[in-house]
């Protein structure tokens, strides 16, 4: 996925402008996280991956967001408010997904064992929990 597809959810048509992209990556914490999330997913060279992984790990601790870069999230990903967001790396998420602070998407044991698959156009409000397959 491309970062511009995610930024479109924040900025609309102006997301294609390089100045708007630059401004948001510098000053908007959720967009910084999404930018490095997408860059790390799409990086091919080992040196680039190591650098991006270091920055990504720093942002995870800084903003308290734990969405591993292995997580499959389609275009239109939006973090509404950052802080205490945890997602299982095996989760599959569809298009236009919004997530707020205090959310958890995790693995469950028992009858509904597994990891959730979340469809398109889903909004997870504050302090929501989705577990199981």
Residues of each region from the PLM?
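Terminal amphipathic alpha-helical/low-complexity segments used for targeting or macromolecular assembly
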Residues: 1-63
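Context-gated lysine
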Residues: 2, 16-18, 39, 72-75, ...
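Left-handed beta-helix
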Residues: 68-69, 74-75, 80-89, 94-95, ...
């Amino acid at each position: 996925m491309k970062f511009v597809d995610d930024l479109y959810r924040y900025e609309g048509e102006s997301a294609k402008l390089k100045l708007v992209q630059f401004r948001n990556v510098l000053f908007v914490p959720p967009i910084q996280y999404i930018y490095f999330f997408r860059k790390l997913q799409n990086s091919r060279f080992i040196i680039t991956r190591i650098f991006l992984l270091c920055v990504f790990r720093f942002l995870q601790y800084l903003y308290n967001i734990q969405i591993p870069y292995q997580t499959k999230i389609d275009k239109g990903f939006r973090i509404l408010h950052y802080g205490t967001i945890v997602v299982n790396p095996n989760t599959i998420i569809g298009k236009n997904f919004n997530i707020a602070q205090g959310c958890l998407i995790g693995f469950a044991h028992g009858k509904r064992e597994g990891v959730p698959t979340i469809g398109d156009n889903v909004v997870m409000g504050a302090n929501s929990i989705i577990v199981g397959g």
